[in-house]
Amino acid sequence: KLWTENAAGDQITVYEASSETDEANFVTNRIISMSKGKNFKDFAVLYRTNAQSNAVENSFKRSGIPYRIIGGTRFFDRAEVKDMLAYLCVINNRADELRLQRIINNPPRGIGGKTLEMAERQAAAAGVPLYTVVSDPYSYPSLEKAAAKLMAFTVIIEECAELLQKLPLPDFYEEVMTRTGYLQMLEEKGDVESRTRAENVRELKSSILSYMENTETPTLAGFLEEIALYTDIEQYDPDADA
């Protein structure tokens, strides 16, 4: 039995939302309506699973409400979310070498650090993007042993790029999750942490849907630009109203 020694206060309100976006917008609007004469840091939102923070974070960002995560990590700062965004970035722009380096052996494909270093040296010597070398490894004798694995990776990227031209963004993302093997890797591990990470990977689709709802002509490039704005947030300032 739950009880409190505090004096009687406002009754608890129950709101049955139609979706996680509706739920997040309700929370946001409620905070805004109650914020007169208060600081945003006077409010707290409790959620049960990490993935649930995504919709609330997105709603706060659109409404200009400052926030910070206590005892956890911002949705777009989570490694698995960064990994999937890296895939999307490379599919959108093959010249994105930083993201390419992040995903080329993630999940493991037998493409080791030495192979990547050799590919980088070849790219630098030829004055071409790293992806150009990786997608044509048989032209470089030093990459011959890893050529099949490198080709298999670039086939995944190219197939996903073709699907981008044919499918709506949410369906395209479903294919990326499957074809890259990233979601399968997490599901096969089966531990609690991996299941949570898999849930976060799926939750990224909600961000795509939210972006589409607020954009007349949604594109992958546009989505990535919006996410870049979300993630370009300064570290927590203890004196800030968040």
Where are these regions (language model features)?
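Helicase P-loop NTPase motor core
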Residues: 1-66, 89-94, 125, 147, ...
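Helix-hairpin-helix
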Residues: 84, 101-123, 142-144
